[in-house]
Amino acid sequence: MYKRQGKARIAREGKDLTIVAHSYMVLEAIRCADVLKVKGVSIEVLDLRSIRPLDTDAILNSVKKTGRLLVADNGWVHFGVSAEIISIVTENIFDRLLCAPERIGMNNSPSPSTRALANNFYPRAKDLAKIVCKILKKKVDLEALFPKSSLSQDIPDPAFNGPF
């Protein structure tokens, strides 16, 4: 099935905060949004679908609506997609932001070569939720909401069918 590149889609509607994600991080962002919804947190998840061309209009429109931004990057945060998205937002609609944008991605270290090292390398929905709660100044028991997964951190969710 062909999807038009350069056109993002809203994977979840929300009003409190925008999570911009691409590739595998879309699944983690959706999981975060769905879990925090039970605590009254309304998260808009924007699935970029492609990073080149980048749908800057969709990003800016979503952040204008929510006033808050978290970029979930499936790469390193330094010099990556998340840095560029935050630059675009702050250069264009800085006055619409209610707080500083945040980003999450892989730890600033080499890719892990063992499962033990992988556990602290790949961001998961719970990691996104921790940042969302910080941004929104919400106290939520994340341990209760996100039970420990039986999957190793270096094994993607079975619902994902892209490269990992």
Segments (PLM) and residue ranges:
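Thiamine diphosphate
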Residues: 3-164
